[in-house]
Design a protein with these regions (language model features):
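Active-site phosphate/pyrophosphate- and oxyanion-stabilizing loops and adjacent acidic/basic residues
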Residues: 27, 53, 57, 92, ...
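Glycine-centered tight turns that cap/initiate beta-strands
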Residues: 42, 64, 100, 144, ...
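Active-site glycine-centered loops adjacent to acidic/histidine catalytic or metal-binding residues
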Residues: 72, 95, 158, 182
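AMP-binding/adenylate-forming catalytic core of the ANL superfamily
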Residues: 11-12, 19-22, 109, 123, ...
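Gly/Ser/Thr-rich phosphate-binding loop
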Residues: 5-22, 30-90, 102-104, 109-112
């Protein structure tokens, strides 16, 4: 069980060289008092998703290893990663399409959007079989499988932006987008503002 106060001691004791993180972990560790163990570890890098852009470089500079932002789903059978320097640490970037994976960003009518616009991330394998390497389907739910694969692309449910250089930038889960006065507001953006306040220990 994760404990911010014991975490570095556990990392040092196990001689871990790679760690996995969720977005809630970096602020919890940064809020801990400086301890000698946090610089006695052998960690080469961390991989995960959801580190707040304002904390990304701060974490790396304090603890001495990079946090590699990745994206993946059980259904896709592969990941994307922002693992090539210079990494885009202040943007929620998680990499460019690679490894035979094609990606595009669409609106609610599945129309492809221009670069830089927020929309749902769709992915598929580049080749005669777009489902190659993906899951075979949702258990006993062929309707949900067909809906996810409509138009020959897998609908991830993630809202992203694809930049002119092909970099994909995470915004939020589609179900977490708040509609207000005609605007799409990512819940993660509001949570980031709250998390930055010194009186807030954790945001859920």
């Amino acid at each position: 069980r994760f404990s911010p106060s014991r975490w570095w001691a556990d990392v040092v004791a196990t001689r871990a060289t790679v760690i996995h993180y969720l977005g809630v972990v970096p602020p919890l560790l940064l809020n801990q008092p400086v301890a000698p163990e946090e610089r006695q570890h052998k960690v080469k890098f961390g991989m995960g998703a959801g580190v707040e852009p304002d904390l990304h470089a701060v974490f790396e500079e304090r603890f001495g290893f990079p946090l590699i932002e990745v994206w993946g789903m059980t259904e896709t059978g592969r990941i994307l990663a922002d693992n090539k320097e210079p990494r885009q640490r202040h943007t929620r970037a998680f990499g460019r399409p690679a490894g035979g994976l094609e990606a595009k960003v669409v609106d609610d009518q599945d129309r492809e959007l221009p670069r830089g616009n927020e929309g749902e991330l769709l992915v598929r394998f580049a080749g005669p079989d777009p489902r190659r390497g993906f899951f075979s389907g949702y258990l006993k739910n062929p309707e949900a499988t067909a809906e996810a694969w409509r138009g020959g692309w897998f609908h991830t449910g993630d809202v992203v932006r694809q930049m002119p250089d092909d970099m994909l930038v995470f915004v939020d889960r589609k179900k977490n987008i708040i509609r207000r006065s005609g605007e799409n507001i990512a819940a993660a953006e509001g949570e980031a503002v709250l998390q930055a306040h010194e009186a807030v220990a954790q945001v859920a």
